[in-house]
């Protein structure tokens, strides 16, 4: 019973995905990533502007690659 329900959900999902991504009525699929990448406004993206914390500033739990400019955080940025 569970397998049948899972198969029905998978078929419905794949059918909906194909319908949403179809470019035209012939069923050709569009590469959404390539289209979106050249339409992006890189100046408006906040991901391009990485803000880091200077050494000696509290950064939280020890981790590598956190908000510190050096990439090392052991309660304070190193």
Curated annotation (Swiss-Prot):
Keyword flag Signal: yes
Organism expressing this protein natively: Conus arenatus
Summary of the function given for this chain in its UniProt record: Omega-conotoxins act at presynaptic membranes, they bind and block voltage-gated calcium channels (Cav).
Regions that span the bilayer: none
Stretch forming the signal peptide: 1-22
Protein name listed in UniProt: Omega-conotoxin-like ArMKLT1-011
GO MF annotation: an example: calcium channel regulator activity
Covalent S-S links between cysteines: 52-69, 59-73, 68-77
Notes on the domains: The presence of a 'disulfide through disulfide knot' structurally defines this protein as a knottin. The cysteine framework is VI/VII (C-C-CC-C-C).
Keyword Endoplasmic reticulum: no
Keywords recorded for this protein, A-Z: Calcium channel impairing toxin, Cleavage on pair of basic residues, Disulfide bond, Ion channel impairing toxin, Knottin, Neurotoxin, Presynaptic neurotoxin, Secreted, Signal, Toxin, Voltage-gated calcium channel impairing toxin
Prosegment residue ranges: 23-48
Tissue: Expressed by the venom duct.
Compartments reported by the entry: Secreted
GO cellular component labels: extracellular region; host cell presynaptic membrane
Family (UniProt): Belongs to the conotoxin O1 superfamily.
